[in-house]
């Protein structure tokens, strides 16, 4: 199972993206990204699919 909170932060750091920039990339609000990174909420299935694709393209290990 993917730890989205950890992986989102890892991806942003690898790509030198702010939460705001990452939110724009996904078409969501900045507070949404903050909540995901804090583990307060999980992304929707549609967003998880986008995240998975970004993580794979970045060569990130997902397990």
Language model regions located:
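A short, Lys/Arg-rich alpha-helix, primarily the initiator
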Residues: 1-14, 52
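Key DNA-contacting residues within the recognition helix of helix-turn-helix
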Residues: 9, 32-35, 44, 52
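Residue-level detection of the helix-turn-helix DNA-binding "recognition helix"
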Residues: 13, 27, 38-40
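Short alpha-helical DNA-recognition segment
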Residues: 16-34
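The DNA-recognition helices of helix-turn-helix-type DNA-binding domains
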Residues: 29, 40, 54, 58
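DNA major-groove recognition helix of helix-turn-helix/homeodomain DNA-binding modules
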Residues: 46-63
């Amino acid at each position: 199972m993917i730890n989205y909170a950890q992986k989102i932060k890892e991806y942003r750091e690898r790509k030198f993206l702010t939460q705001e920039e990452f939110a724009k990339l996904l078409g969501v609000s900045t507070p949404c990204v903050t909540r995901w990174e804090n583990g307060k909420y999980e992304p929707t299935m549609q967003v998880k699919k986008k995240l998975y694709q970004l993580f794979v393209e970045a060569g990130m290990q997902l397990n």
